[in-house]
Amino acid sequence: MAKEFSRGQRVAQEMQKEIAIILQREVKDPRVGMATVSGVEVSRDLAYAKVYVTFLNVLTENADPNLVPNGIKALEDASGYIRTLLGKAMRLRVVPELTFAYDNSLVEGMRMSNLVTNVVKNDAERRSASGDDEEA
């Protein structure tokens, strides 16, 4: 009977949970801000892990354009500390080397949602305007 998930996928899921907790409770760098771990990809030999993060501060109107690069830089600077805490939290022979990448799927999803909302609103306005013209 085959396993549903490979060991790498199970380790990645557990790492995602643990790194999220570490970022929330242990990392005090203000550049990290409201970082959320959206996914983790682990190499087959579990030596490397790519951690995808989103920053919820990006969604605000007056967001700093350097927020994402500064946040990723802060996470890269703290990767050794995060890796140490991850090693204590998880029982792995070798703790993967962490690299951080920005995941813009949340921002893109919000943008797409806004586009759809605007199209529906414009369509409703056109229908009401054409309905008014036909009645006159």
From Swiss-Prot:
Question: Please, one GO biological process term?
Answer: maturation of SSU-rRNA
Which Pfam families has this protein been placed in?
RBFA (PF02033)
Keywords linked to the UniProt accession: Cytoplasm, Ribosome biogenesis
Q: State the superkingdom.
A: Bacteria
Any idea where this protein resides?
Cytoplasm
GO CC annotation: cytosol
Q: One MF term in GO for this entry? A: ribosomal small subunit binding
Q: Does the keyword Chaperone apply?
A: no
Report the sequence similarity comment from the record.
Answer: Belongs to the RbfA family.
* Quaternary structure and interacting proteins, as annotated: Monomer. Binds 30S ribosomal subunits, but not 50S ribosomal subunits or 70S ribosomes.
| Function of the molecule | One of several proteins that assist in the late maturation steps of the functional core of the 30S ribosomal subunit. Associates with free 30S ribosomal subunits (but not with 30S subunits that are part of 70S ribosomes or polysomes). Required for efficient processing of 16S rRNA. May interact with the 5'-terminal helix region of 16S rRNA.
State what protein this is by name. Answer: Ribosome-binding factor A
